[in-house]
Amino acid sequence: MKKPVVIGLAIAAIVAVIAGGTWWYQSRQDDGLTLYGNVDIRTVNISFRVGGRLASLNVDEGDTIKAGQVLGELDHAPYENALMQAKAGVSVAQAQYDLMLAGYRDEEIAQAAAAVRQAQAAYDYAQNFYNRQQGLWKSRTISANDLENARSSRDQAQATLKSAQDKLSQYRTGNREQDIAQAKASLEQAKAQLAQAQLDLQDTTLIAPANGTLLTRAVEPGSMLNAGSTVLTLSLTRPVWVRAYVDERNLSQTQPGRDILLYTDGRPDKPYHGKIGFVSPTAEFTPKTVETPDLRTDLVYRLRIIVTDADDALRQGMPVTVKFNDEARHE
C-alpha cells in the first residue's frame, strides 16, 4: 500500500475516533437531567424581645458574625430597677408566708386574751346598765330614747367582745389552711415576676443566633425600639442550599439523597457537589425567577439541594446549573 493511502486512512481513523468520542460524550451529557436554580437566600431578622432605648451596636454591614456574639445592647437602667422591685416583692411575700407557717407568738396570744377580758368587762357593764334602764323605763323615769341608747351601747360592746374572742381563737389554733395557701400562692407569683424581670434584663443584650454575614443595620444607637423591631438582618452562610424545580415527568429522578453536580459561571469546569435533601410534596407553577426552556404554565416541584463542599465563592442568589447525569456518581 502506498504511503499517502496509509496516511489518509490513519487520518480518517483519527477523525472517526474523535467524532465518535464527541458523539458519545454529548449523548452522555444529553442523557442526564439538567435543571436551573439559585443558591437559596436565607436571612434572619434580629430584634430585641423587649423595648427600650438602643444604647450600642457593635457590628456593621458586611461583618462576619459568629453564633453567640454580642451584637448590641439596650439601656439597662429601667430593667435593673424592675429587677430590684421584683426581688423586694419576693422578700415581702416570703416573710408573709413564713409568718403564716409559724403561727402566733405567746406574747400575741396573751395580748389577745387580755383584749377578750377587757371586752368582756365592757360588755358586762353595758348589759347591766341596759337592765337598769329597762326598769326605769317601766316606771317611766326615763325616755324611750334613753332606753334605745343603752341597748345600742350593749349591742356594740357585744360585737367588740365577739371580735376579740374570734381573734383569740385564731391565735390559739393558728392560721387557716386557706390563708396559708393564699400566702404561698402570693410567694410563687412574686417569684415568677422576679424570673420575668431577670429574663427581661437578660434580653437587653442582643446575641447572634447563628453564624453569618451582616446584611443590614436598620437602626442606630439612641433610637427608641419596640419589642420585636428589626435591628439587624443576618445572612446565614451555612448550610448552603440550592433551590431548583423539576417537572412531573422527571420527578422520579429526584430521590432524596441522590448525588448532584452544581455548575456556576465562575467555575464551569469545576462543579460543586451536593445531595437532594428535600422534594416538595406539592406542585406549583414555575416561579418567574427560575431560568427554564419550558413553558412557565407547567407545574413543577421544588427541590432543596444541600451543597456538601460549599466555599465563600458560592454566594446567595447566585444562579447554578444542576446536573443529574452519571458524572455525579464518579466525581
Curated annotation (Swiss-Prot):
It is found in: Periplasm. Residues 1-19 form the signal peptide. Keywords: Coiled coil, Periplasm, Signal. GO terms for biological process: response to antibiotic. Residues 140-209 form a coiled coil. Its main location: periplasm. Pfam families: HlyD_D23. One of its GO terms (cellular component) is periplasmic space. Belongs to the UPF0194 family. HAMAP family: UPF0194. PANTHER family: EFFLUX SYSTEM COMPONENT YKNX-RELATED (PTHR32347), UPF0194 MEMBRANE PROTEIN YBHG (PTHR32347:SF29). This is UPF0194 membrane protein YbhG. It comes from Salmonella typhimurium (strain LT2 / SGSC1412 / ATCC 700720). The gene is ybhG.
